[in-house]
Amino acid sequence: IEAAKLLDPDDLSVYIGIPFCPTRCAYCSFVSQSIERFGEFLPAYLDALLREIAHTGKLLQASGFHIRTLYIGGGTPTTLSSARMAQLLEAIHTSFDLSRCLEFTVEGGRPDTLDEEKLRVIKAGSATRISINPQTMSDKVLAAVGRRHTARQTIEAFYQAVRAGFDDINMDLIAGLPDDDEEGFADSIRQVLALGPSNITVHTLALKKGAALFSSRAPLPPQEAVAAMLAGAEDALRDNGYEPYYLY
């Protein structure tokens, strides 16, 4: 409500999508493709995206609308190389007036796509917030959902982001992933809390037809266990000073 008071009728949010990932997570139903299989299309996609950004910038300038929030999501935007990320950010600044932008987020969802060079490029491009999303801090669960990184890489990516100058870092976790249980999820919460990100977003696994887990019918934690995961997470987060900040 307080944030809404800062907005005017001419304010808007801009979302820029990069529909590529290192691998496709088993729970994912978004429009996104593995860079290994479809990476040849990335240069053409980026070229088209840059043209669209330029065109959109002209429309915004003519209409008088103001960007208040900007979000680069995906997919995994940090699948882009440092050079391509710099190219994207330069196009954004060339085409968009960000003088009234309250928050500029880049989704760095996969820790294995982050390094200090890329994070510094993103920070230099005036991003104010980055999201580093382990989804779980269990290497066993990560393997079960097809993510090729470890919990250790998540921790390393977090501290790299801090060294790059980010002080607004979000981290996502998902309750209900295969091979997870109440104690495992509680441990993920504990490990993320130990890092002290500014936001912790807890999702519940929601499978749709496009997800590999939907068609495979792999065994998942029972609903009662997922409910307990969420209740435990809320207690732990509130005990550590975190408050609910948005509805997903």
What annotation goes with each model-predicted range?
Residues 14-15, 73:
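Short, well-ordered beta-strand segments
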